[in-house]
A protein has these predicted regions:
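Short, surface-exposed beta-strand/strand-loop-strand elements in extracellular ectodomains
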Residues: 97-112
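Bacterial N-terminal signal peptides that target proteins for export
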Residues: 1-2
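C-terminal motif of bacterial Sec signal peptides marking the signal peptidase cleavage site
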Residues: 9-12
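Short, well-structured beta-strand segments within conserved domains
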Residues: 83-89, 106, 124-128, 133-152
Length: 170
């Protein structure tokens, strides 16, 4: 019995070890430490207000924030081989019942970058490769997310959509 156990234990042992090189390393997106904001923000971040240029409700509702007619964010975009703009947003049932389908115009640094039509309420994820000629590398960049329609809130406030997170990813 001992010889059977010993045979099983040594069966996988071999004298030849295969060697594999480590995967290619590249630096992660890095930012100057003096900036109050970076290349991506979640609305749950206590520092989310530093990214907001305008067009948002003043207070956050926890992990998300209401937008108004022309929400604008600012990001510091470091040099990277390839970046995508990512936006997680929600069109709540209550406001969508007033607006119907919404067309969102996305502007990068003041230039129209894309138009997207959202035909149903609920959570949505927008992502698109961002050509370097649209960005200012190692500098502050603005992203405007303009809905073509807004809904009237209970106090008359114009509500666009709910933003959860946005920014640039590799």
């Amino acid at each position: 019995m001992f010889s059977i156990v010993l045979a099983f234990l040594t069966a996988g042992c071999g004298s030849r070890l295969e060697w594999y090189p480590p995967p290619e390393q590249r630096p992660s997106l890095s930012l100057p430490s003096s900036l109050p904001f970076g290349y991506f923000v979640a609305m749950s971040d206590p520092n989310a207000g530093a990214y907001i240029v305008g067009g948002f409700r003043d207070q956050s509702e926890g992990v998300w924030r209401w937008t108004h007619e022309r929400p604008v964010l600012q990001f510091y975009v470091p040099r990277a081989p390839r970046l995508r703009l990512l936006v997680d947003l929600t069109f709540p049932d209550q406001t969508f019942a007033q607006t119907g389908p919404v067309e969102l115009t996305i502007r990068l640094n003041g230039k129209e970058f894309d138009r997207v039509r959202y035909a149903k309420p609920g959570s949505q994820e927008y992502t698109k490769d961002t050509p370097w000629e649209w960005l200012h590398p190692d500098a502050v960049n603005t992203v405007a997310l303009e809905p073509d329609k807004t809904a009237a809130g209970p106090d008359g406030e114009r509500l666009g959509f709910v933003l959860t997170r946005a920014g640039f990813v590799e």
